[in-house]
Amino acid sequence: MNYEKTFFKIQSKVLDFYSELPFNIYDSIETAAKKIDSNNALTAYPPLKKIFDDENIKKIIDIGSGGGWFINSLSSLYPDKDMLGVDFNKVAVDYANKVSKKKNLKCRFERKNIFELNDVKDTYDFASSLGVLHHTPDCHIGIKIISNMLKKNSYFFLGLYHKYGREPFLDYFRNMESLTEEKKFEKFKELRNLENEKHAFSWFRDQVLHPHETLHTFEEINNLFKSLNFKIISTSINKFSENFLEKDIIELEKKCYNISKERLNEKKYYPGFFIILAQKC
């Protein structure tokens, strides 16, 4: 019972937080629509091109789609694929649908809670969840639910906060607890000065003020994927090279701690975030 209470309390806090201002949105629908053309998903994530060029990849779902940039971008590049973005925040879903409509895209966005999607089985050819599950009450359960949505040989594109890369950033802002929110925002912009003020503030809130997050490692997620009958194809930790040994990635990821500290000392933003591309066996 205590677990259930904690579970729903976390969900409620996160929903309230994002209802106030969803992550990665702009001051207007027009600006967001233009950004899709100038910053598309294939540029951000090159390993996806080979997958999406495959005609067998037909049904795509993005879990925790937020403002919709990822799916809207992919839909603009692959208009004939069936693409769905789901998020539990109505404000974000409405925003994403407006951007999609502005661009005359075929993708759609629906309000759904991942933890209520247990009945969706063997449906999708590709699933993504980028920067989402570490804000849920149980990241591993979320991964298991998404894995069940996927068909055999389908793909899972997962992005999570990285324990080694993220911790220095958290410490950096913990040392500023006495500062006002406005001052913290200025400090954040010293690291990552995005040109659109609302966009920058949505990033700042998400990165610095979020009420709940968990940190993860390649080693941890690799073991979980193995238990779910998935094979990791590549990871951002080694710049998505497909030729790797697990032990080398595990050693490499630990070095991200010092890299993160060095970037902060140089007043540079370091994401503290890693991505894994996995395939269901």
Regions found by a protein language model. Give the residues of each.
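A short glycine-rich, Lys/Arg-flanked "PGG" loop and its adjoining helix->strand segment in the class I
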Residues: 141-152
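A short SAM/SAH-binding and catalytic strip from SAM-dependent methyltransferases
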Residues: 126-137
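Conserved alpha-helix/loop element of class I SAM-dependent methyltransferases that forms part
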Residues: 31-56
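Substrate-binding/catalytic lobe of Class I Rossmann-like enzymes that use SAM or dcSAM, i.e.
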Residues: 171, 180-246
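Conserved class I S-adenosyl-L-methionine
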Residues: 155-188
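Class I SAM-dependent methyltransferase "Motif I" SAM/SAH-binding loop
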Residues: 64-68
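A short acidic, Gly/Pro-enriched loop at the edge of an enzyme's catalytic core
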Residues: 118-126
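Class I SAM-dependent methyltransferase SAM/SAH-binding core
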Residues: 69-111, 115
